[in-house]
Amino acid sequence: MPKMKTKSSAKKRFKMTATGKVRAGQAGKRHGMIKRTTKFIRTARGTTILSAPDAKIVKSYMPYSR
């Protein structure tokens, strides 16, 4: 059986933590930031942990991640 392929789009957008959770960048920061509140910009600065249903889908895209 051939090796499974990792989806390139997923490996560029998501990182796995040491405990197996999926980390992703916050959404909604590409354009239109002038109308966003300062609080939104500040809280969307870092990354976030995906919810369990979303993480399950992303993990299926990256079969060889930790």
Swiss-Prot record:
InterPro entries attached to this UniProt entry: Ribosomal_bL35, Ribosomal_bL35-like, Ribosomal_bL35_CS, Ribosomal_bL35_sf
Gene3D superfamilies: 4.10.410.60
Alphabetical UniProt keywords: Ribonucleoprotein, Ribosomal protein
Ranges for region Disordered: 1-32
Gene Ontology cellular-component annotations: cytosolic large ribosomal subunit
Pfam families per UniProt: Ribosomal_L35p
One example GO MF annotation: structural constituent of ribosome
Domain of life the protein comes from: Bacteria
BP GO terms, sorted: translation
Keyword 4Fe-4S in record: no
Compositionally skewed regions (Basic residues) per UniProt: 1-15
Family per similarity comment: Belongs to the bacterial ribosomal protein bL35 family.
Protein name: Large ribosomal subunit protein bL35
Protein's organism: Dinoroseobacter shibae (strain DSM 16493 / NCIMB 14021 / DFL 12)
Lineage: Bacteria, Pseudomonadati, Pseudomonadota, Alphaproteobacteria, Rhodobacterales
Gene: rpmI
